[in-house]
Regions:
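N-terminal leader/linker segments that initiate helical-solenoid repeat arrays
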Residues: 17-73, 84, 89, 93, ...
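Start-of-helix register in tetratricopeptide repeats
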Residues: 39, 73, 107-110, 144, ...
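Residue-level recognition of tetratricopeptide repeat
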Residues: 46, 80, 117, 151, ...
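Register position in tetratricopeptide repeats
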Residues: 50-51, 84-85, 117-122, 155-156, ...
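Single-residue signature of alpha-solenoid repeat helices
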Residues: 57, 91, 128, 162, ...
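Conserved structural position within tetratricopeptide repeats
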Residues: 63-66, 99-103, 133-137, 170-171, ...
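Short coil turns that delineate tetratricopeptide repeat
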Residues: 69, 103-106, 140, 174, ...
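Canonical tetratricopeptide repeat
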Residues: 77, 111-114, 148, 182, ...
Length: 293
């Protein structure tokens, strides 16, 4: 109860020093008294945010904005509060105002991250990249930056740029399996040429010989594109020994056996795959079974 009374007294005191007829003061003409008021309400707002009293924090920060309408830090904190209150559009407006209020090249990394996430969630890819560029100007280029660029370009549908973002990072760390797998995924999705695709499979397996997903995909592609069926069977065999009930691996192994005219054994593995498959993965297995006479 005492907390509520204190808050009411605070607001009454605030209205007493801010007459309703007054215009918003300009930051250049802030008096010492107004500066003291600003600091008081600012720290009260910060405490309210810490205590998750966001509605109260919003009121206090609005009064801070009344005193300093172009204060970037206040606008940023208002954006955080609006987010916490579930007001996405208002939060975006506050963050963008905070960005514009600060001299070029001085926006905080936290503000840039907030704007980048908002732009990415709204498919505003150019704006998101601009924010990442500014982040990189403040911090050392790293895996997080490369990953962000890869994600933006991939979701934007710019596959070549996504691969370029990955390759740029791999120049710094050529053995990073995460980025090698990202690159492989893009090559698989875009139907890359066999030579380039197989080189990537081999590169990953040199670093991680027991990567079951890569072994499975490599084996399936090799078997279905005129490659060495025995080598495909060998790689696929590793996957089902490691995960004997994995329907995807069983399906691949069964289909490779079928391509080698071992249909009875192929049916055994395909039926086992179907038995272990969830509904979403059954269609391809059924097609393979129906193809075997």
């Amino acid at each position: 109860m005492s907390g509520k009374i204190e808050h009411i007294v605070l607001l009454v005191a605030l209205f007493a020093v801010l007459p309703l007829s007054a215009k918003k003061p300009q930051q250049a003409s802030i008096s010492a008294e107004q500066e003291q008021q600003f600091k008081y309400y600012w720290y009260a707002a910060r405490q309210a945010i810490t205590d998750e009293r966001y509605a109260e924090a919003y009121t206090l920060l609005e009064f801070c904005r009344w005193i300093k309408p172009n204060d970037g830090t206040t606008l940023y904190q208002l954006g955080i509060v609006q987010q916490s209150l579930g007001h996405a559009d208002q939060a975006r407006e506050c963050f963008e105002q905070a960005y514009k209020a600060q001299p070029k090249g001085t926006a905080s990394e936290n503000l840039l991250e907030q704007l980048k996430r908002i732009y990415m969630s709204n498919s505003e890819w150019e704006k998101a990249l601009k924010m990442q560029d500014e982040i990189d100007d403040r911090t050392e280029y790293d895996a997080y930056s490369a990953l962000t660029r890869y994600r933006i370009y991939a979701m934007w549908g710019k596959t070549k740029d996504a691969i370029k973002a990955i390759d740029t990072y791999l120049e710094h760390d050529p053995t990073d399996l995460r980025f090698l797998l990202f690159r492989l995924e893009l090559l698989e999705q875009t139907g890359a040429k066999k030579k380039e695709l197989y080189a990537m499979y081999d590169r990953i397996l040199e670093l991680d010989p027991r990567n079951l997903m890569v072994l499975n995909n490599y084996a399936y592609h090799m078997a279905t594109h005129g490659g060495d069926l025995k080598e495909a069977e060998r790689m696929s065999g590793i996957t089902i020994r490691e995960e004997p009930n994995n329907p995807v691996y069983l399906d691949t192994y069964g289909w490779i056996l079928h391509l080698q005219q071992q249909d009875d054994l192929a049916k055994f593995y395909l039926k086992k795959a179907l038995w272990n498959a969830k509904d979403a993965t059954k269609e391809e297995i059924i097609k393979h079974l129906e193809a075997i006479k």
